[in-house]
C-alpha cells in the first residue's frame, strides 16, 4: 500500500479503495498534457452489465487437468481496443447485431464488419465503437504501468538469480524491493476496470466497463473454440 500511495501521489488511505486512487492517477497524467479533467457528477448505477466469463464445471474426476492464465487480460484488452471514456464513440449496434456468441459463431453480418474495417475504429463485443486515431488516456496509463511492472519483475528475477550464484545477503533487499514495486504495479493495473464500473468514479461508464468484460469473454471463449490436438474441456 505504501508503494502504491507513493507512486500514485495519494494518501495511504486512498489506496484501500479504487476510485480515489485512479482518479488522482488520471488527474496527474492528464495534467502533464495540459488537459483539464471533467467535473465529477453524481451518477446512479441504474443498469446491470455483463461481467466476466465463468465456464460451467464438468462434474467428475478428470485426468491431465490444466489451467491457463491470460497475462494482464483486462489491461491488454484496454490497450488492444483503445478503450477509454474519451475514445468511446457510442453503441450503434445492439445485442441482435453483435455479441460474444455471434462473434464466436461467425453470425455477425458481413456489411457490419466491412463497414468497421473502413473506419479507423475498434468494435467491442457489446457493440461499442472506439476511435483509434488518438490513443486514450486509459490505454496510455495501462501501457506505462505494464512496462514498469515488466521492468521491475525482470530486475527481481535477475537479483534472485544473482543471489543463487553469490549468496550475497545484500541482494535480499533488492529482491524484496523489486518484488514490492512490481506487485504494486500489478494491483494498479488490475484495479482500473473496477473503478470504471463504479458509479462513484469520475469516469464511470457502463458501456466502457462492459466493453472490457465482453472483450475478455471473447478472448477466453476463443481458447475453447480454437483447433487443438485435444478439445479443451474446461
Give the ranges of each region predicted by the language model.
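Conserved catalytic alpha/beta cores of large enzymes that bind or transform nucleotide phosphates
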Residues: 97-143, 150
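Non-transmembrane amphipathic alpha-helical segments
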Residues: 145-159, 185
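Conserved small/polar residues in nucleotide/adenosyl-binding loops
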Residues: 224-229
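Conserved hydrophobic/aromatic pocket- or pore-lining residues that grip, position, or stack substrates
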Residues: 149, 189, 220
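Short amphipathic alpha-helix segments
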Residues: 217-223
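Common nucleic-acid-contacting/processivity interface regions adjacent to the catalytic cores
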Residues: 1-85, 91, 170-217
Amino acid at each position: 500500500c505504501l508503494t502504491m500511495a507513493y507512486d500514485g501521489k495519494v494518501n495511504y488511505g486512498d489506496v484501500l479503495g479504487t476510485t480515489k486512487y485512479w482518479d488522482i492517477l488520471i488527474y496527474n497524467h492528464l495534467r502533464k498534457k495540459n488537459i483539464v479533467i471533467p467535473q465529477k457528477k453524481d451518477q446512479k448505477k441504474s443498469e446491470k452489465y455483463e461481467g466476466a466469463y465463468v465456464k460451467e464445471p464438468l462434474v467428475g474426476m478428470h485426468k491431465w487437468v490444466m489451467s491457463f492464465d491470460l497475462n494482464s487480460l483486462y489491461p491488454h484488452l484496454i490497450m488492444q481496443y483503445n478503450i477509454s471514456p474519451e475514445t468511446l464513440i457510442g453503441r450503434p449496434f445492439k445485442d441482435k447485431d453483435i455479441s460474444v456468441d455471434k462473434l464466436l459463431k461467425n453470425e455477425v453480418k458481413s456489411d457490419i464488419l466491412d463497414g468497421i474495417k473502413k473506419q479507423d475504429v475498434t468494435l467491442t463485443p457489446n457493440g461499442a465503437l472506439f476511435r483509434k486515431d488518438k490513443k486514450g488516456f486509459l490505454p496510455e496509463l495501462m501501457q506505462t504501468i505494464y512496462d514498469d511492472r515488466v521492468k521491475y519483475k525482470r530486475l527481481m528475477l535477475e537479483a534472485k538469480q544473482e543471489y543463487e550464484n553469490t549468496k550475497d545477503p545484500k541482494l535480499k533487499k533488492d529482491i524484496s524491493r523489486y518484488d514490492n514495486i512490481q506487485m504494486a504495479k500489478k494491483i494498479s493495473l488490475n484495479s482500473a476496470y473496477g473503478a470504471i464500473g463504479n458509479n462513484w468514479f469520475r469516469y464511470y461508464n457502463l458501456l466502457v466497463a462492459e466493453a472490457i468484460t465482453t472483450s475478455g469473454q471473447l478472448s477466453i471463449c476463443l481458447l475453447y473454440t480454437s483447433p487443438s490436438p485435444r478439445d479443451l474441456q474446461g
